[in-house]
Amino acid sequence: MAKHPVPKKKTSKSKRDMRRSHHALTVPAMNDCPQCHGKKLSHHICPNCGYYDGRQVLAV
């Protein structure tokens, strides 16, 4: 059976936190729908009215 490598030294809290500094989640940007003025994601169909790019794509 092969032996796996193990850490030689304990990772400090500072090193651990510096490694995790890029792991934060970001809030998606919400835009106003030009048809119903509800909130929607960019480049997505509006969940309130079903419009995308000025035309109705989904019957809501």
UniProtKB/Swiss-Prot annotation:
GO terms for cellular component: large ribosomal subunit. GO terms for biological process: translation. Residues 1-26 are annotated as: Disordered. Signal peptide: none annotated. GO terms for molecular function: structural constituent of ribosome. Keywords: Ribonucleoprotein, Ribosomal protein. Pfam families: Ribosomal_L32p. Residues 1-23 have a biased composition (Basic residues). It comes from the Bacteria. Belongs to the bacterial ribosomal protein bL32 family. This is Large ribosomal subunit protein bL32. The lineage of its organism: Bacteria, Thermotogati, Deinococcota, Deinococci, Deinococcales.
